[in-house]
Amino acid sequence: MIRFLGNIEAKADAKGRVFIPAQFRRQLQSGSEDKLIMRKDVFQDCLVLYPEEVWNEELDELRQRLNKWNANHQLIFRQFVSDVEIITMDGNGRILIPKRYLQITGIQSDVRFIGVDNKIEIWAKERAEKLFMEPKAFGAALEEIMKEERRTTNNELK
């Protein structure tokens, strides 16, 4: 399974083409992923780039949770899959970000790629800089989460 890690800056050209960072490109090529799926994130103003296999797994999980005989579920599924672009890297390792995505996300020239487990987020640099907690707040939040996990695990063992 592919795991993307890191936070890498890049530049998009006037046409919206951007080089996928080398470390991510190597991982994609080692997994023989030639097709990538791009969509706007459901919650944030960034793009999410999925290897095709990961996209298919996420789509299968969503499909399993939805009832195809429920009109609202059909609407949700349709919206989720319709706002997608199938992307391929060119021979130089670049992808083209569609104009509508550039506008929605505020991406101009400075781009930030963030590896988030099995997918890659693509952010306008100035928006990405506002994403992260201050180190002390991050440490405290992580400590609290891990305490809760340990309490839950310890209670299950009793």
From Swiss-Prot:
It is found in: Cytoplasm, Nucleoid. The keyword Iron does not apply. GO terms for biological process: negative regulation of DNA-templated transcription initiation. One of its GO terms (cellular component) is cytoplasm. Residues 7-54, 84-127 form the SpoVT-AbrB domain. Belongs to the MraZ family. This is Transcriptional regulator MraZ. The gene is mraZ.
